[in-house]
Each structure stands twice: as structure tokens, then as C-alpha cells.
Design a protein with these regions (language model features):
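Conserved short alpha-helical segments that host acidic/polar catalytic motifs at enzyme active sites
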Residues: 18-228
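Extreme N-terminal basic, low-complexity initiation segments
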Residues: 2-9
């Protein structure tokens, strides 16, 4: 599907937001997987194929035994792999999203690393939200608090504020408010096994087949798994 949405154009049709799992020069890396394989292993492997893009932190969110579980770490991808091999060795699942971050808003840190999560969702992002300060002020007035200095956390909580049980509707409403370039991969807590993704300006590809689906910022991330 064509995932591109341009601000000022007619509202994006519902079938133009990519839903996986149900029958500028920004160099962050996004991956997502849903299928029969171990999602933790697939996410780490696909993220390793995006290391050439440069990054300062990495993280993943996976549908585990306790809902969406998120692990992230400053520094090299190996730091994340070590956390997953030891402190979070029990994390397992078949659907998740991953991210390597190149800082644009907020210094490199565990808190600023992606994914950014709320009780309702977890989100990874490549791009720059130009009006995030205005959106953050509006969300703060609604009672939201922020733990990072990133525009990504603002995007996550904006979608959270608009969510009424329909992921596609919430994403469309958020896109009407967001200014800038972005690609999102999103898990919704009440939609286990599914990934929702959309983009405006920033690169994002989607592939599906043989009972599994992928999203990625670039082809090399998933080339060994699929060519569809």
C-alpha cells in the first residue's frame, strides 16, 4: 500500500494505513515484525542490518506475557542485546517493533531512546515533528506528563489522547495535527499481534507473506526474510 500522507491533502483513506498481522535525512531506524518466529530475535537481527545508518541508542517493544513490554538502552545495539539476554531473558513473543535512534530532540539516554509507550500503545518514530512544542503544551494542559525531551513521546501521547478503540481513526486524527516528516510503527495494547504503520516524508517499507509481515526503514533490514 501507499503509506504516504501529505499535509493539506484529503484525509487518508482507512486502507492507506498499513496494518500488519490481521488476515528528510533523518537516520533513525525502524523495524517491525509479526508472525510465527521469535520476535525478539528477529527485531535484533533486523536492527543490526540498519546499524550503518548511525545511532546512539536502541530499543524494542514486544507483545509478551504481560502485554506490551519495552526494553531500551543507550549506546550500541549490543547493550540492548545484553539486557535481553540477561535482565529480560524471559521476554518472548511473536509481534513487536524496534528502533535505533539518532538524536534530534533530547540527548542520547535510556529515557530518550525509543520505543515510547503509554498504557494504550508503544511507538517508534523516524523524522522530526516540527510543532511538537505546541502539541506538548496542549497535552500538558490535558494532564499528560512527559519523562523525555523527545518529539516522539509527544506523538505517542497525542495518539493516546485521540484513541477510542480504533487505531486507524486515532492515527488519522493525529496526522491532521502533526507537522513535519515522520514514519511511525505502533503497537496498540488491545490489538495484540498487530502492527500499525504510516509515514509522511520519512522512508518506510512494508512486506508480507507466508503468515508474517514486516516494516522497516530500509530494504536491507528485512531482505533475508522476505522479498515481497
Amino acid at each position: 500500500p501507499d503509506l504516504d500522507t501529505l499535509r493539506g491533502r484529503p484525509r487518508m483513506p482507512r486502507d492507506q494505513i498499513y496494518r500488519a498481522g490481521k488476515t528528510g535525512n533523518n537516520m533513525c531506524g525502524i523495524v517491525g515484525y509479526t508472525g510465527g518466529k521469535n520476535a525478539v530475535r528477529v527485531l535484533l537481527d533486523t536492527l543490526s542490518n540498519l546499524e550503518y545508518r548511525g545511532y546512539d541508542s536502541a530499543g524494542i517493544s514486544v507483545f509478551g506475557d504481560n502485554g506490551i513490554e519495552t526494553v531500551k538502552a543507550k549506546g550500541r545495539l549490543q547493550n540492548l542485546a545484553d539486557l535481553l539476554a540477561h535482565e529480560h531473558a524471559k521476554l518472548s513473543g511473536h509481534c513487536g517493533i524496534g528502533h535505533t535512534r539518532w538524536a534530534t530532540h533530547g540527548e542520547p539516554s535510556d529515557l530518550n531512546a525509543h520505543p515510547h509507550a503509554t498504557e494504550k500503545l508503544s511507538l517508534v518514530h523516524n523524522g522530526i515533528i516540527e510543532n511538537y512544542q505546541q502539541l506538548k503544551a496542549s497535552l500538558t494542559a490535558q494532564g499528560y506528563t512527559f519523562v523525555s525531551r523527545t518529539d516522539t513521546e509527544v506523538a505517542a501521547k497525542l495518539i493516546d489522547s485521540l484513541y477510542r478503540g480504533d487505531p486507524v481513526a486515532a492515527i488519522i486524527k493525529a496526522q491532521e495535527l502533526l507537522e513535519g516528516s515522520y514514519a511511525f510503527g505502533i503497537l496498540f495494547a488491545d490489538h495484540p499481534g498487530e502492527i500499525f504503520a504510516t509515514r509522511q516524508g520519512s522512508p518506510l517499507i512494508a512486506a508480507a507473506g507466508n503468515g508474517e509481515a514486516f516494516i522497516a526503514s530500509d530494504v536491507p533490514a528485512i531482505l533475508k526474510y522476505t522479498r515481497d
